[in-house]
């Protein structure tokens, strides 16, 4: 997604060595990974459907496990090249009725953004399903949630400016159509049957498969919104430290940003229903990945994990082929029943990695995936929180030391209980709020040492932790008092 929108990277050997020479000896062409940044823009033009899933250069030999590892290793970059990629989703709704917007309305918004603000359209089977502009993209989630995948940026000031620019554009086009956008983690008012379905091939496959593997997968697809940050690593060891820190602290971020307390017009019993939903979506591809904390963990272990996550699809001839439940290992040797003789390309691997949904996800960067969607200030605060912790060596070491003796059972307990009790969740001799205070200070210190005057972006986090009141609890209090037990005012309260 966001940080992936970098220049295409040819395969890199796991040891950083002479991959090109070895590849030529094995009789293969050098194949770059095609990404958004590698394509030119034509003013007001259209580009192929996202993701770009078919390679122009045909493989002469099957991919090996080494190649799959090398794809991940190619994300390693020196600290001076680390960037911040922020993604967020939001619900579009009709201002007059509060109903979710349909695809026709979304198409009109996309066309309006393309015409007024010079975005290129992404088209699938004659339907506009997204937009691109430089290294930014706008895409549609299954229920029409609008997602901005931001460009890889150097500072949080740039990140927040990007978010503000996007929200200005969306508001300018949407207001003329009587459409608003809501920053919350779960659809507060409407039932699953009220949510429109987007015309994207991969989502049809997922929609049919989800009920077979969990009870809440369709809710995840159609009624949730998140904000996440994508961050870089310099080496395998740096990736491991950040992955472990991110997983251990993900429930703390879930508590701080908890913002999904309503469902179908009433409180739902959770502070972050969105987070809870992931616990019964598809446990083959989600969760806290305890193996990341094993001494043997590294790129190879993640590849082994990903190879065993059941597939969703293969994309060939501009069509999605349903491969749900099939093995990428079988695909590697040309034995997919739905695509006999077909062998995977690096793009197939790239696509497969996007169908894995743990609390922290590894691609050629790490994605922090634990936070609910929220209003614009929190869209700036979430990346600030993680940048201060993971991009500063001293703070990262402090987090590693703090969490090194946490057990798998403790991490799972936090994952399970935080969506219900948030900052009030007991942990050891205190509460998650106590942990959050300590972690916030480490994040502030990390941002101070970066030297870009970015600490102010943590004000929202500071306010939540110092008060002990999560965003969800604040909404619940409004619901019981000022809103007189109606969720309708939340559409104005959290309007972008």
Curated annotation (Swiss-Prot):
Q: Which Pfam families match?
A: GCS2
From the UniProt record, give the pathway where this protein acts.
Answer: Sulfur metabolism; glutathione biosynthesis; glutathione from L-cysteine and L-glutamate: step 1/2
- What SUPFAM superfamilies does this protein's entry cite? Glutamine synthetase/guanido kinase
Keyword line: ATP-binding, Chloroplast, Disulfide bond, Glutathione biosynthesis, Ligase, Nucleotide-binding, Plastid, Transit peptide
The family database entries (InterPro entries) matched by this protein are listed as: GCL_bact_plant (IPR035434), GCS2 (IPR006336), Gln_synth/guanido_kin_cat_dom (IPR014746), Glut_cys_lig_pln_type (IPR011556)
Keyword Ligase included in the entry's annotation: yes
- Give the protein name, as stated in the record: Glutamate--cysteine ligase B, chloroplastic
Organism classification, top ranks?
Eukaryota, Viridiplantae, Streptophyta, Embryophyta, Tracheophyta
Q: Gene name, please? A: GSH1-2
């Amino acid at each position: 997604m966001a940080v992936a929108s970098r220049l295409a990277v040819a395969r890199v050997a796991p040891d950083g060595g002479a991959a090109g020479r070895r590849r030529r000896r094995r009789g293969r062409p050098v194949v770059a990974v095609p990404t958004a940044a590698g394509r030119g823009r034509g003013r007001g033009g259209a580009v192929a459907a996202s993701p770009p899933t078919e390679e122009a250069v045909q493989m002469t030999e099957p991919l090996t496990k080494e190649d799959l590892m090398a794809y991940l290793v190619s994300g390693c970059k020196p600290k001076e090249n680390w960037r911040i990629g922020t993604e967020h989703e939001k619900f579009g709704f009709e201002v007059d009725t509060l109903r979710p917007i349909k695809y026709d309305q979304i198409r009109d918004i996309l066309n309006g953004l393309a015409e007024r603000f010079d975005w290129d359209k992404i088209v699938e089977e004659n339907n506009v399903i997204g937009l691109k502009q430089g290294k930014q993209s706008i895409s549609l989630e299954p229920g029409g949630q609008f997602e901005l995948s931001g460009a890889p940026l150097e500072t949080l000031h740039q990140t927040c400016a990007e978010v503000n620019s996007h929200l200005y554009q969306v508001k300018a086009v949407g207001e003329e159509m009587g459409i608003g956008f809501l920053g919350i983690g779960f659809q507060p008012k409407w039932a699953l049957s009220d949510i429109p379905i987007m015309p994207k091939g991969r989502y049809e496959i997922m929609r049919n498969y989800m009920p077979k593997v969990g009870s809440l997968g369709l809710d995840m697809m159609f009624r949730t919104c998140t904000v996440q940050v994508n961050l870089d690593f310099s080496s395998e060891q740096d990736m491991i430290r950040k992955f472990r820190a991110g997983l251990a602290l993900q429930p703390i971020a879930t508590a701080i940003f908890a913002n999904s307390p309503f469902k179908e017009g009433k409180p739902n019993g959770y502070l972050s229903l969105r987070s809870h939903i992931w616990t019964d979506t598809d446990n083959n591809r989600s969760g806290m990945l305890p193996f990341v904390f094993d001494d043997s963990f590294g790129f190879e272990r993640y590849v082994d994990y990903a190879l065993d996550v059941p597939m969703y699809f293969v994309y060939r001839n501009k069509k999605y082929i349903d491969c749900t439940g099939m093995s990428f290992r079988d695909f590697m040797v040309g034995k997919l029943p739905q695509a006999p003789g077909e062998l995977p390309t690096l793009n197939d691997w790239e696509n497969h990695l996007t169908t894995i949904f743990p609390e922290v996800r590894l691609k050629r960067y790490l994605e922090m995936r634990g936070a609910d969607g929220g209003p614009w200030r929190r869209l700036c605060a979430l990346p600030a929180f993680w940048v201060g912790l993971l991009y500063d060596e001293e703070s990262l070491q402090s987090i590693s030391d703090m969490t090194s003796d946490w057990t798998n059972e403790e991490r799972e307990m936090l994952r399970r209980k935080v969506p219900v009790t948030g900052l009030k969740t007991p942990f050891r001799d205190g509460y998650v709020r106590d942990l959050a205070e300590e972690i916030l200070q480490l994040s502030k210190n990390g941002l101070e040492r970066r030297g870009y005057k970015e600490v102010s972006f943590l004000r929202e986090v500071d306010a939540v932790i110092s008060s002990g009141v999560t965003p969800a609890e604040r909404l619940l209090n409004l619901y019981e008092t000022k809103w007189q037990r109606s969720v309708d005012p939340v559409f104005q309260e959290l309007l972008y």
